[in-house]
């Protein structure tokens, strides 16, 4: 399982 979290302002 692969989880990608990305946050951008």
From Swiss-Prot:
Source organism of the structure: Pseudotsuga menziesii
Lineage per the UniProt record: Eukaryota, Viridiplantae, Streptophyta, Embryophyta, Tracheophyta
Name the record gives this protein: Unknown protein 23
Top-rank taxon: Eukaryota
């Amino acid at each position: 399982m692969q989880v990608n979290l990305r946050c951008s302002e």
